[in-house]
Design a protein with these regions (language model features):
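Extended active-site and interfacial segments that coordinate phosphate-rich ligands
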Residues: 20-51, 55-69, 141-168
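Conserved phosphate/anionic-ligand binding catalytic regions in large, soluble enzymes, centered on
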Residues: 2-22, 73, 130-142, 146-148, ...
Length: 380
């Protein structure tokens, strides 16, 4: 499993490490599983980042690719039950997945005795309830158990003690969908694409103020400038591109000086950015980046599970502080306070919700400071 690619979820955690950990883990006896025999495969299909739609398109176009990948994962790690945790706003994907699952059962590709092998794997779809925080794996597991979606403290990791207290693989749709391709072509063929530790291809989603939005699959190593100018053909408005946000609503705003950075996990980390799920949102020269920074704080206020104070309170105070800066009130002191708040959120939050919210805020503050001098207070 060492040749397995990095996951295609926001954290890009190596899928092979998760699988190996679950394979080696010993299930624990619980009230639900007194014999301690169960392991799980969970697909995170709660695609909630703004500007992302690759998961939805794949599930609607080829649900069997996801089913096959999850079945292989189950057989590989010794799991007999899988769940697809699907975003509730995807009714078409929900219908098509259930049709595909029924056909897979009828053809004996999943069930009690897969193709006469004596191996079992069962798979079901479960709908989320619309909470962005349930894209975080431990919140997802809480929701899947029928509880309020709230972040769990780690350790224990889900691979050791996940769904219903049992060893659980939690992978993204694109990660699991790539499994059959890797097995068919071989790890060497898959790793021939890309650069550094970023191997294979990435489903890049172009959105925002872009002339040609949509989904493109490219090998790692392509630059943002190539993606936006060559594939996206610039802005829809015709105005110059001012900023590019990569990695969803918690991604940094990148100015033109950083657009030649290759699409690579390590290269992005060096400039304080992240690739995330591959969503790219384009802003033209009319965009108010201070308003976008405030929106990031507002988004965190609305979507925080509320479990940890840095996220729950920090985002509220962050939005208030941005308003004060834009109103010209004690600008120097409030700017320092905003940076301190961001540092507390980054260092003290339990999960990426609060930990990454400072990314768009600080990048806007550092790269587009002139927008924070505006006397207009953004109201959201």
């Amino acid at each position: 499993m060492s040749a397995w690619p990095d996951g295609r979820g926001g954290a890009a955690f190596p899928a092979g490490i998760k699988w190996q950990t679950v394979l080696d883990a010993v299930p624990q006896a619980t009230r639900r599983h007194p014999a301690g025999e169960q392991k799980y495969i969970v697909c995170n299909a709660d695609e909630g980042d703004s500007g992302t739609f690759a998961d939805r398109l794949l599930m609607e176009a080829d649900p069997y690719q996801l089913i096959e990948g999850m079945t292989i994962a189950g057989l590989a790690v010794g799991a007999t039950q899988g769940y697809i945790y699907l975003r509730s706003e995807y009714p078409v994907a929900h219908r098509l997945l259930n049709i595909a699952l029924q056909r897979a059962v009828e053809e004996n590709f999943i069930g009690d005795n897969i193709q006469g092998s004596g191996r079992a794997f069962h798979l079901e779809v479960r709908l989320g309830a619309g909470a962005y925080i349930c894209g975080e794996e431990t919140s997802l597991l809480e929701s899947l158990e029928g509880k309020r979606g709230m972040v769990r403290a780690k350790p224990p990791l889900p691979a050791i003690e996940g769904l219903f207290g049992q060893p659980t693989v939690v992978n993204n749709v694109l990660t699991l969908a790539a499994v059959s391709t890797v097995l068919e072509s071989g790890a060497a063929a898959y790793e021939s694409f890309g650069m550094g530790r970023s191997r294979g291809t990435l489903a890049i989603q172009l959105a925002g103020n872009i002339k040609r939005g949509g989904l493109i699959e490219l090998a790692f190593g392509v630059t943002l400038r190539e993606i936006v100018e060559d594939y996206g053909q610039g802005t829809h408005s015709g105005l110059p591109v001012r900023a590019i946000q990569v990695g969803g609503p918690l991604g940094a705003f990148l100015p033109e000086s950083q657009w030649d950075t290759p699409l690579d996990y390590e290269a992005f980390a060096k400039i304080g950015a992240m690739i995330g799920h591959g969503g790219i949102v384009v802003f033209d020269s009319s965009a108010d980046m201070a308003a976008q920074a405030r929106f990031a704080m507002e988004f965190c206020v609305a979507e925080s599970c509320g479990k940890c104070t840095p996220c729950r309170i920090g985002a509220v105070r962050g939005a208030e502080t941005i308003d004060k800066i834009r109103a010209g009130r004690n600008v120097k002191a409030n700017t320092e306070l905003l940076r301190d708040l961001c540092d507390v959120m980054t260092q003290g939050s339990l999960c990426a919700m609060g930990g990454l919210t400072p990314n768009p805020v600080l990048s806007a503050l550092n790269q587009f400071p002139e927008d924070f001098a505006s006397p207009v207070i953004a109201t959201g």
